[in-house]
Design a protein with these regions (language model features):
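Active-site-adjacent "subsite" loops/lids of carbohydrate-active enzymes
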Residues: 1-63
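Glycoside hydrolase catalytic-domain groove-lining segments
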Residues: 97-233
Length: 247
């Protein structure tokens, strides 16, 4: 059963305070980044992890469902794939405040209690490793809560993730190498990054080495990106340890 995780519209009216806030103070509730459907929840708000875990278990518990598949299990893109910059008339050579999440009151207070620093007062937030890790860990805790609940129901769990996972940490605050899922589907859309098919192999290799046998890696390939060198792309994925490919 496939369902978006952090990107949820159904709570706009009931829990407007649950939505992530960027460094400019704008909430995904009423001013989402990039596109109207980017309505991301803050992973640190009390009740968010519990709500999501219960929502997935409700589906996993159905007898005809073998497992759940997470998607949008991350923050909004602080850095978009480079080929998409032109679509929005932007150049993300640095982390721009309107795409940098989350700076809501809950996140600020939790980080300040932990480090003594207000993230809004950091001179270089993109270089502050404590602040980076704080947000990586917040998403991981949500995933852990969902995973624990789903596995208690003896169902499988997988996720669509950004490639890397080094790129995932940098681009969307997604540290999926620390998760404990059964399978990962990194979205290795090579032309999004102006890369050739050999990049697919490098990305798969990093992913396989990261999970180190704990989970399967299925390379998510964009057919339009590989149609002219389809066999080479598949060889790159399989020769570097992918258990399969998806498109």
């Amino acid at each position: 059963y496939w369902k978006w995780t952090m990107n949820r519209r159904e709570l706009l009216d009931k829990h407007p305070d649950w939505y992530a806030v960027n460094r400019k103070g704008e909430s995904c509730h009423d001013k989402p980044a990039y596109v109207d459907y980017y309505r991301f929840l803050c992973p640190n708000h009390q009740g968010v992890a519990e709500y999501l875990a219960e929502d997935y278990v409700k589906e996993a518990h159905k007898p005809y469902v073998d497992g759940v598949h997470l998607d949008y299990v991350r923050m909004p893109d602080v850095i978009l794939p480079v080929s998409l910059w032109k679509n929005y008339g932007i150049e993300q050579k640095e982390e721009l405040p309107e795409y940098d999440y989350c700076y809501c009151d809950v996140c600020r207070e939790l980080f300040k209690a932990k480090t003594g620093q207000d993230p809004l007062e950091l001179k270089y937030p993109m270089e502050n490793q404590s602040w980076i890790n704080f947000r990586l860990d917040a998403i991981t805790r949500v995933v852990d809560a969902i995973t624990k609940a789903v596995k208690a129901d003896h169902k499988a769990i997988s996720a669509a993730v950004f490639p890397g996972p080094s790129m995932a940490r940098h681009m969307v605050r997604q540290d999926w190498g620390e998760w404990t899922l059964d399978a990962y589907y990194p979205m290795i859309y090579n032309k999004f990054y102006y890369e050739g098919p050999e990049w697919i192999g490098r990305s798969v290799k990093e992913s396989v080495e990261t999970v180190n046998g704990r989970a399967k890696i299925y390379a998510g390939l964009m057919f339009g990106d590989i149609k002219d060198n389809f066999e080479e792309a598949l060889d790159e994925a399989y020769n570097n340890g992918a258990s399969g490919v998806s498109s």
